[in-house]
Amino acid sequence: LKTGFIGAGKVGFTLGKYLTEHGKKVTGYYSRNTHSAREAAQFTDTKACDSLAELIHESDVLFLTVPDSSITSVYEEIAAHPIRGKYICHCSGEKTSAEAFPDIDKTGAYEYSVHPLFAVSDKYHAYEELPDVFFTIEGNKDHLDGIRGMLSEAGLQTRLIDPADKTRYHAAAAAASNLVIGLLDQSISMLGECGFSEEDARAALTPLVLGNVRHLLRDGTVQALTGPVERSDTETVRKHLASLDSRRDRVLYSLLSLRLADIAQRKHPDRDYTAVEKILEEFAE
Protein backbone atom coordinates (compact mmCIF):
# COMPACT_ATOMS: atom_id res chain seq x y z
CA LEU A 1 0.00 0.00 0.00
CA LYS A 2 1.27 3.46 -0.94
CA THR A 3 0.54 6.14 1.64
CA GLY A 4 0.02 9.85 1.06
CA PHE A 5 -0.35 12.62 3.62
CA ILE A 6 -2.66 15.59 3.42
CA GLY A 7 -1.30 18.08 5.90
CA ALA A 8 2.36 18.38 6.83
CA GLY A 9 2.39 19.13 10.53
CA LYS A 10 4.00 17.21 13.39
CA VAL A 11 1.91 14.05 13.02
CA GLY A 12 2.35 13.94 9.23
CA PHE A 13 6.11 14.43 9.57
CA THR A 14 6.39 11.77 12.27
CA LEU A 15 4.27 9.02 10.74
CA GLY A 16 5.61 9.59 7.23
CA LYS A 17 9.21 9.43 8.39
CA TYR A 18 8.57 6.29 10.41
CA LEU A 19 6.90 4.49 7.51
CA THR A 20 9.68 5.34 5.06
CA GLU A 21 12.31 4.25 7.58
CA HIS A 22 10.53 0.89 7.94
CA GLY A 23 10.17 -0.10 4.34
CA LYS A 24 6.75 1.34 3.54
CA LYS A 25 6.10 3.36 0.40
CA VAL A 26 5.12 6.97 1.05
CA THR A 27 4.06 8.83 -2.08
CA GLY A 28 4.39 12.26 -0.54
CA TYR A 29 2.59 15.26 0.92
CA TYR A 30 0.02 17.81 -0.10
CA SER A 31 -0.68 20.93 1.94
CA ARG A 32 -2.06 24.38 1.33
CA ASN A 33 1.14 25.49 3.03
CA THR A 34 3.50 24.54 0.21
CA HIS A 35 6.57 25.27 2.34
CA SER A 36 5.56 22.70 4.98
CA ALA A 37 4.79 20.11 2.28
CA ARG A 38 8.23 20.61 0.72
CA GLU A 39 9.88 20.45 4.15
CA ALA A 40 8.09 17.19 5.01
CA ALA A 41 8.93 15.72 1.61
CA GLN A 42 12.59 16.56 2.05
CA PHE A 43 12.62 15.09 5.57
CA THR A 44 11.04 11.82 4.39
CA ASP A 45 12.79 11.66 1.02
CA THR A 46 9.44 11.71 -0.78
CA LYS A 47 7.80 14.49 -2.78
CA ALA A 48 5.50 17.47 -2.37
CA CYS A 49 2.54 17.09 -4.70
CA ASP A 50 1.38 20.11 -6.65
CA SER A 51 -2.28 19.18 -6.33
CA LEU A 52 -4.62 17.16 -4.17
CA ALA A 53 -5.64 15.17 -7.24
CA GLU A 54 -2.03 14.10 -7.83
CA LEU A 55 -1.62 12.78 -4.29
CA ILE A 56 -4.97 10.98 -4.37
CA HIS A 57 -4.23 9.35 -7.71
CA GLU A 58 -0.84 8.02 -6.57
CA SER A 59 -1.88 6.79 -3.10
CA ASP A 60 -3.76 3.76 -1.78
CA VAL A 61 -3.91 5.15 1.75
CA LEU A 62 -4.59 8.80 2.57
CA PHE A 63 -3.83 10.16 6.03
CA LEU A 64 -5.54 13.45 6.80
CA THR A 65 -3.01 14.83 9.28
CA VAL A 66 -4.75 18.18 9.69
CA PRO A 67 -6.31 19.88 12.75
CA ASP A 68 -9.40 18.10 14.08
CA SER A 69 -11.61 21.01 13.08
CA SER A 70 -10.50 20.69 9.45
CA ILE A 71 -10.76 16.91 8.97
CA THR A 72 -14.31 16.79 7.62
CA SER A 73 -13.93 19.77 5.30
CA VAL A 74 -10.72 18.29 3.86
CA TYR A 75 -12.44 14.94 3.46
CA GLU A 76 -15.25 16.62 1.53
CA GLU A 77 -12.64 17.94 -0.91
CA ILE A 78 -11.20 14.44 -1.26
CA ALA A 79 -14.64 12.91 -1.80
CA ALA A 80 -15.03 14.98 -4.96
CA HIS A 81 -12.27 12.83 -6.50
CA PRO A 82 -12.34 9.11 -7.38
CA ILE A 83 -11.43 7.39 -4.10
CA ARG A 84 -13.13 4.00 -4.45
CA GLY A 85 -11.05 1.29 -2.79
CA LYS A 86 -8.77 3.73 -0.97
CA TYR A 87 -8.18 3.84 2.79
CA ILE A 88 -9.06 7.26 4.22
CA CYS A 89 -7.60 7.79 7.69
CA HIS A 90 -7.41 10.51 10.30
CA CYS A 91 -5.34 10.62 13.49
CA SER A 92 -7.75 12.38 15.85
CA GLY A 93 -8.10 10.86 19.29
CA GLU A 94 -11.59 12.23 19.81
CA LYS A 95 -13.40 11.86 16.47
CA THR A 96 -14.67 8.54 15.20
CA SER A 97 -14.20 7.65 11.56
CA ALA A 98 -17.96 7.94 10.97
CA GLU A 99 -18.06 11.44 12.45
CA ALA A 100 -15.06 12.59 10.46
CA PHE A 101 -16.06 11.06 7.12
CA PRO A 102 -19.86 11.33 6.71
CA ASP A 103 -21.48 9.23 3.99
CA ILE A 104 -18.14 7.74 2.94
CA ASP A 105 -19.87 4.51 1.94
CA LYS A 106 -21.22 6.36 -1.09
CA THR A 107 -17.66 6.86 -2.37
CA GLY A 108 -16.55 3.23 -2.07
CA ALA A 109 -13.59 4.23 0.14
CA TYR A 110 -12.78 2.70 3.55
CA GLU A 111 -12.80 4.95 6.61
CA TYR A 112 -10.48 4.64 9.63
CA SER A 113 -9.43 6.47 12.74
CA VAL A 114 -5.77 5.67 13.45
CA HIS A 115 -4.73 7.43 16.65
CA PRO A 116 -1.24 7.30 18.18
CA LEU A 117 -1.53 7.34 21.97
CA PHE A 118 1.39 9.71 22.13
CA ALA A 119 2.09 13.44 22.38
CA VAL A 120 4.08 14.40 19.27
CA SER A 121 6.22 17.31 20.42
CA ASP A 122 9.20 17.27 18.04
CA LYS A 123 8.44 16.62 14.39
CA TYR A 124 12.05 15.78 13.58
CA HIS A 125 12.68 13.17 16.29
CA ALA A 126 9.33 11.82 17.51
CA TYR A 127 9.32 9.05 14.88
CA GLU A 128 12.14 7.35 16.81
CA GLU A 129 9.72 6.75 19.70
CA LEU A 130 6.86 5.23 17.70
CA PRO A 131 7.83 1.55 18.27
CA ASP A 132 6.75 2.03 21.91
CA VAL A 133 3.47 3.74 21.00
CA PHE A 134 0.01 2.13 20.80
CA PHE A 135 -2.10 3.02 17.76
CA THR A 136 -5.82 2.60 18.33
CA ILE A 137 -7.88 1.82 15.22
CA GLU A 138 -11.58 1.83 14.43
CA GLY A 139 -13.47 1.96 11.16
CA ASN A 140 -14.59 -0.19 8.23
CA LYS A 141 -14.52 -3.78 9.52
CA ASP A 142 -14.46 -5.40 6.09
CA HIS A 143 -11.04 -4.03 5.17
CA LEU A 144 -9.48 -3.68 8.61
CA ASP A 145 -6.74 -6.21 7.89
CA GLY A 146 -5.32 -3.95 5.19
CA ILE A 147 -4.64 -0.86 7.29
CA ARG A 148 -3.83 -2.78 10.47
CA GLY A 149 -1.54 -5.13 8.57
CA MET A 150 0.39 -2.25 7.02
CA LEU A 151 1.03 -0.67 10.41
CA SER A 152 1.91 -3.99 12.06
CA GLU A 153 4.34 -4.88 9.26
CA ALA A 154 6.09 -1.58 9.98
CA GLY A 155 6.55 -2.65 13.60
CA LEU A 156 3.80 -0.53 15.14
CA GLN A 157 1.61 -1.76 18.00
CA THR A 158 -2.10 -1.61 17.17
CA ARG A 159 -5.26 -2.09 19.18
CA LEU A 160 -8.87 -2.02 18.02
CA ILE A 161 -11.33 0.25 19.80
CA ASP A 162 -15.11 0.42 19.70
CA PRO A 163 -16.29 3.77 18.27
CA ALA A 164 -18.68 4.10 21.22
CA ASP A 165 -15.65 4.20 23.55
CA LYS A 166 -13.72 6.83 21.61
CA THR A 167 -14.57 9.86 23.75
CA ARG A 168 -13.90 8.04 27.04
CA TYR A 169 -10.64 6.73 25.57
CA HIS A 170 -9.63 10.26 24.60
CA ALA A 171 -10.51 11.54 28.08
CA ALA A 172 -8.27 8.82 29.55
CA ALA A 173 -5.43 9.96 27.30
CA ALA A 174 -6.02 13.58 28.29
CA ALA A 175 -5.92 12.64 31.97
CA ALA A 176 -2.53 10.96 31.58
CA SER A 177 -1.04 13.46 29.15
CA ASN A 178 -2.65 16.83 29.91
CA LEU A 179 -4.24 16.82 33.36
CA VAL A 180 -1.03 15.62 34.97
CA ILE A 181 0.61 18.81 33.65
CA GLY A 182 -1.91 20.86 35.61
CA LEU A 183 -1.24 18.82 38.73
CA LEU A 184 2.53 19.22 38.43
CA ASP A 185 2.14 22.93 37.72
CA GLN A 186 0.27 23.23 41.01
CA SER A 187 3.08 21.39 42.79
CA ILE A 188 5.69 23.69 41.23
CA SER A 189 3.66 26.75 42.27
CA MET A 190 3.38 25.47 45.84
CA LEU A 191 7.14 24.94 46.01
CA GLY A 192 7.53 28.48 44.66
CA GLU A 193 5.55 29.70 47.67
CA CYS A 194 8.13 27.85 49.80
CA GLY A 195 10.98 29.83 48.22
CA PHE A 196 11.96 27.54 45.33
CA SER A 197 12.71 29.01 41.93
CA GLU A 198 10.79 27.33 39.11
CA GLU A 199 14.00 25.71 37.86
CA ASP A 200 14.84 24.38 41.32
CA ALA A 201 11.28 23.13 41.80
CA ARG A 202 11.41 21.16 38.56
CA ALA A 203 14.80 19.72 39.47
CA ALA A 204 13.58 18.74 42.93
CA LEU A 205 10.44 17.06 41.61
CA THR A 206 12.12 15.19 38.76
CA PRO A 207 13.38 12.13 40.71
CA LEU A 208 10.13 11.97 42.69
CA VAL A 209 7.93 12.07 39.58
CA LEU A 210 10.05 9.77 37.43
CA GLY A 211 10.54 7.25 40.22
CA ASN A 212 6.82 7.17 40.92
CA VAL A 213 5.93 6.72 37.25
CA ARG A 214 8.49 3.92 36.85
CA HIS A 215 7.06 2.15 39.90
CA LEU A 216 3.50 2.58 38.64
CA LEU A 217 4.30 1.28 35.16
CA ARG A 218 6.24 -1.67 36.53
CA ASP A 219 3.97 -2.73 39.39
CA GLY A 220 0.60 -1.00 38.91
CA THR A 221 -1.19 1.77 40.78
CA VAL A 222 -1.95 -0.26 43.92
CA GLN A 223 1.67 -1.16 44.63
CA ALA A 224 2.94 2.30 43.63
CA LEU A 225 0.72 4.14 46.11
CA THR A 226 2.41 5.67 49.16
CA GLY A 227 1.77 8.72 51.31
CA PRO A 228 -0.59 9.99 54.01
CA VAL A 229 -3.83 8.82 52.39
CA GLU A 230 -2.45 5.29 51.97
CA ARG A 231 -1.45 5.35 55.66
CA SER A 232 -4.85 6.82 56.64
CA ASP A 233 -2.91 9.66 58.29
CA THR A 234 -5.78 12.02 59.04
CA GLU A 235 -3.63 14.59 60.87
CA THR A 236 -1.32 15.10 57.88
CA VAL A 237 -4.23 15.26 55.45
CA ARG A 238 -5.87 17.97 57.60
CA LYS A 239 -2.63 19.96 57.67
CA HIS A 240 -2.23 19.66 53.90
CA LEU A 241 -5.74 21.02 53.34
CA ALA A 242 -5.17 23.86 55.82
CA SER A 243 -2.00 24.87 53.97
CA LEU A 244 -3.83 25.39 50.67
CA ASP A 245 -4.99 28.96 50.20
CA SER A 246 -7.59 28.58 47.47
CA ARG A 247 -10.82 26.60 47.54
CA ARG A 248 -10.05 25.26 44.07
CA ASP A 249 -6.75 23.79 45.27
CA ARG A 250 -8.46 22.19 48.27
CA VAL A 251 -11.15 20.68 46.03
CA LEU A 252 -8.52 19.31 43.65
CA TYR A 253 -6.49 17.83 46.51
CA SER A 254 -9.62 16.28 48.05
CA LEU A 255 -11.04 14.77 44.86
CA LEU A 256 -7.74 13.18 43.88
CA SER A 257 -7.15 11.99 47.43
CA LEU A 258 -10.55 10.30 47.46
CA ARG A 259 -9.42 8.40 44.39
CA LEU A 260 -6.25 7.47 46.29
CA ALA A 261 -8.39 6.24 49.18
CA ASP A 262 -10.14 3.85 46.79
CA ILE A 263 -6.75 2.55 45.63
CA ALA A 264 -5.53 2.31 49.22
CA GLN A 265 -8.56 0.22 50.17
CA ARG A 266 -7.64 -2.26 47.44
CA LYS A 267 -4.08 -2.35 48.78
CA HIS A 268 -5.19 -2.78 52.40
CA PRO A 269 -8.67 -4.42 52.41
CA ASP A 270 -8.67 -4.71 56.20
CA ARG A 271 -7.77 -1.06 56.87
CA ASP A 272 -10.50 1.48 57.70
CA TYR A 273 -10.35 4.63 55.56
CA THR A 274 -13.66 6.08 56.76
CA ALA A 275 -12.07 8.88 58.82
CA VAL A 276 -9.79 10.16 56.08
CA GLU A 277 -12.58 9.93 53.50
CA LYS A 278 -14.88 11.97 55.74
CA ILE A 279 -12.29 14.76 55.97
CA LEU A 280 -11.76 14.77 52.22
CA GLU A 281 -15.47 14.75 51.42
CA GLU A 282 -15.90 17.97 53.44
CA PHE A 283 -13.71 19.80 50.92
CA ALA A 284 -14.56 17.91 47.73
CA GLU A 285 -17.60 19.97 46.72
Language-model features and meaning:
Residues 1-58:
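NAD(P)+-binding Rossmann beta1-loop-alpha1 motif at the extreme N-terminus of oxidoreductases
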Residues 27-31, 88-90, 135-138:
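Short, hydrophobic beta-strand segments that form beta-sheet elements in well-ordered domains
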Residues 39-43, 126-218, 280:
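Internal alpha-helical scaffold of NAD(P)-dependent oxidoreductase catalytic cores
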Residues 47-125:
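Rossmann-like NAD(P)(H) cofactor-binding subdomain of soluble oxidoreductases
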